Every structure is written in C-alpha cells, then in structure tokens.
C-alpha cells in the first residue's frame, strides 16, 4: 500500500514538471521547526490551589506539626490526621503554632516543596533531555496524609545525620546513602557486590511483554531480537533457564527449549503451558526471568539435562515437572475416548491408567504421568505428555447463554473433571448474584470478611516462605546410610529407615505390579 502511494506521488510530481516549460526552475526550501521548550512553573499564581513551600520552610512546618500531634491525648493511628488535629485544637490550652500554614495546606489540592537539595528522591530518577532539574517534591492532598506519612517526611527532611560522622560498627544498618542503606547495598541483587566487585554491569535487560500460551511442554519462544542480541548470531537447539520470582518452589526454575521466532517484529513471549503449574505462574503481572545459556558449553548442557530437564528428571520431590493447566484438563476430559484409545496402544500405560480409576480425572492424569515415569523412564512420561498436548491442539472453548446465565454447561464438566472450581463455588456465586443493592448489612459484612481473609492470607504467604526456607536448610543435612536416616554426619542417626512413611518410599501399588 505504501509503495503504491509513493509511486502515485512520483507520477503526479513527474506530470507537474512535464506541464511546465523547460526554463521553469522549481525551488524547494525547508522551514526551521520551532524547538519545543519545557518550563517549570514555580510561580504560585499560575497554578490553582497549590501550596508552595521552600525546603527550609517545610522543615519548620513539619517540626511544629509533629509537636502539635504529640499533644493528642487520644492517639489512635487509625484516625485521620484531621480527626487528630481536631482533638488537639479543641483543647483550649493548646494553641495552634501555625494556623495560616495549616489552613493553606488543607485548602490546597497538593503541596509542592521547592529548592530541594540533591538527595535520594532525585538520584533514583532517570533524567533525560526533556526532564527539568527536578528540585521539587509534589505531595498529595492533605486528606491522604496519615501519621506514618508525616513521621516519614520528618525523617527525610529533618535528618540529624546529614553530614555527621557515624560509628560504622553500630550504624552500618542505618546509614543512608543516595541509594539506600549500606547493608542493602552489600546484600541486594543490584548493590555494590553485583555491580562493582565484578568490575562490570551485568548484561541484563527487562521489558514488559504479552504472554501467549503455547499448548506445549517446557518450551519458550522469546522475541527474535533478544536471542540475536545475546548470541550475536543465528543459533539453534538453545536452552534457557526460566525462573519465576519469588522462587519459593524447586519448580520455579525450569529448563526450557528455545524456539526461534520466524517474525522479527513479534515482541510477544510464547511460553509452553507445561511449566506453569509447577512454578505457580499466571499471566497477571508475574515476573519471569529468562536466562540464556552460553553455547556451546557442554558442562552447562549436561547440568541442565541432569537437574532441570523433564526428559531425564520428570519427578521433582512430590511434583511432576510438567503438568496440565485446568483448560487442558477439561479438553482431555472431553476427548477421553480418543485418549484411552491412545493409552491402549501401549498396554503398560493403560494398565497404570486403570490402577487409579476411582480417582478424579485431574488427579488420575498426574498419577499416571508419575507412575509411568517410575516404571518406564522420565523420557517416556515426557513423550506421553507431548502426545496428549497434540491430541487437544485444535480444541477451543466458547461460553454461551447456559454458562453465562445459569453457570451450567461447560462449568459442570469442568468441575466433574477436577480441572477447576467446585459445586460449592457455583452455589455461592448464585447466592451472591441474588444479593440486593440495598442490602447494606450483607454487603458490608462480606467486604469485612474479604478484607480480613486477604490480610491473613498475605501473612500466611510470608510465614510459609519462612517455613519453606527453614525446612530446606534442615533437609539439606539429612541423608540415608546403612538403612538409617542420618543428620549432618554418619554417627548422628535419627531413626531406622523402616520408620519412614510410605510417601517417602517407592509406591507400593507399583511394587505389587512387579511382584505379580
């Protein structure tokens, strides 16, 4: 299309020139474009309802403000600052030290502190040619301030240790540099230890990308240019580590095969669904780090195969390295006849499938892949998983009126297969749907319950993280020797191997198959 328009333009231009006499001279001139300039508005009269204070003025205001707040006899951190100030100033004995300033702050839409010295706020910002010299700080409307915010501002503006000498041994964890506390600088992943001790900045690049899910195994297809940028040449048969952060599970890091994208303008990342459940990944803003591995490097390659590749290491503790996501489970449930026909082509697979016929479909699939790996090999389970993904390659799901209005249809099969949800979820959703807008009592109690469960689950995540770390540290020192479970050394025996629960041992139903 562009080429066609360009050609027509040239044709038109040629015709115009031909219609003139040969003596005519056509002149072209280019006008200078006026440069765009950005000015910082520091004149308070040009802005509506803004409270301007210089750095020095604001320091004094904060000091007086906190002094007044300390006089509050009924201190409650959940009260707004306005409530706390009303409590203070209704007491006749307390005199407001700065009534004009306070009125100015409350009436304004925002507070701007000007003439700031160079500090942590500014150093963190990346500046470019369009950025002014940022020597101001914009604070939100006073209604959004709370007690903690004021204390934080006071620490930032009225810091006692600005130019003092401090005792390193005691204050190492408290000294603030332009980028934060020294302790963090030594320990954090972007601190001195990483950037300066290695005498180089590591070649990292991060970007936001749309994730397109591949109905596949442990495979990824990153943007073509990211592979080219790393290797500097065309490569094939490349491996990469994919790690989800925070990585609290052994399966957060997995080895993936890198497929080269044919398109050079496709900036999406395509990820195989097999590694999603293990790493607890979803596509709502999760952070995933893709680490390309040097090629050729046979040592790293062999490590990948030994520790992270489902072809050679399908089971990781009590989980499979590859699992199906709920939509795939539903599709397989729909195609159960075709799937069982595939199993019958390999008698061993069908025998294992029949072993767990009383289990729900989703659990049955997991158990089949695990058992097949233990009896045949990791690679056998990997290939079976791959075959099953190909079986449902062209499936799709479309919701109609039955699903939208009655929560029936495909939802019923999805619950039956064990892919997602439960009958109770459907029941409670229908119950919630019937709630009236005017039923304030019910809505408010649900909101409170929801908030409380959110807070408690947030706490649980932190506690679980600590527990997982603790268990890992302890279990690293546990090993089996001479039919005893030992801790740290051979002499420190904890118990006989017979006391181990059956979950730690080879599954009994598979041993029975060999004995029979």
Curated annotation (Swiss-Prot):
Component of the viral DNA-dependent RNA polymerase which is composed of four equimolar subunits of LEF-4, LEF-8, LEF-9, and p47. Plays an essential role in late and very late gene expression. Keywords: Transcription, Transcription regulation. GO terms for biological process: DNA-templated viral transcription. Interacts with LEF-8, LEF-9, and p47. InterPro entries: LEF-9. It comes from the Viruses. This is DNA-directed RNA polymerase subunit LEF-9. The keyword Transcription regulation applies. The keyword Transcription applies. Disulfide bonds: none annotated. Belongs to the baculoviridae LEF-9 family.
